[in-house]
Amino acid sequence: MSRYRGPRVRIIRRLGTLPGLTNKTPQLKSGSINQSTSNKKISQYRIRLEEKQKLRFHYGITERQLLNYVRIARRAKGSTGEVLLQLSEMRLDNVIFRLGMAPTIPGARQLVNHRHILVNDYIVDIPSYRCKPQDFITIKNQQKSETIISKNIEFYQKSKIPNHLTYSSLEKKGLVNQILDRESIGLKINELLVVEYYSRQA
């Protein structure tokens, strides 16, 4: 399944706030979706499916990528759900978003694809690149790159940067301090439901 490119508002109306997908918040009309489904029994499958979709749309990953992350998480030590979230959060496009260098993860992905971003002084144009502790993220030394990202930081670096990341406005440099813990996840989600959804596939 390819990456979703349709209207983002439609997604957040169905799944709730997804800050990685869009900085808009859902505005439900009275008597709309939630009310119409409140009297219906929602199946366990649908609950798991919607939680999986939250993860996929928030991080902007394909079905194949998500299934691959689940398989990696199952082989790793520790909680499968927590490792799954760590794999998603440590993607380069998400790290750029959490640093406030882009308004959304699709915006961060565009910066990476257009070669505006360096990791450890090397251009990386793969949004799914998995960042590691002590990786540092900088801006390509070109006026266009610096202007775009400086504007993003000015307008979008409003919320507190999570503890596993640091950003130096003086050096225009982001640093991955460590692998993040569960409390630093940028999405309200029940990851165990996602793992259960893939229980027969991974």
UniProtKB/Swiss-Prot annotation:
Membrane-crossing residue ranges in chain numbering: none
Keywords noted in UniProt: Chloroplast, Plastid, Ribonucleoprotein, Ribosomal protein, RNA-binding, rRNA-binding
Chain ranges of the S4 RNA-binding domain: 90-153
CDD domains (UniProt xref): S4
InterPro entries membership: Ribosomal_uS4, Ribosomal_uS4_bac-type, Ribosomal_uS4_N, S4_RNA-bd, S4_RNA-bd_sf
A biological process from GO: ribosomal small subunit biogenesis
Main location: plastid
Compartment(s) of residence: Plastid, Chloroplast
One example GO MF annotation: rRNA binding
Cellular component GO terms held in the UniProt record: chloroplast; small ribosomal subunit
HAMAP family, per database record: Ribosomal_uS4_B
Family: Belongs to the universal ribosomal protein uS4 family.
Biological role stated in the UniProt entry: One of the primary rRNA binding proteins, it binds directly to 16S rRNA where it nucleates assembly of the body of the 30S subunit.
Name of this protein: Small ribosomal subunit protein uS4c
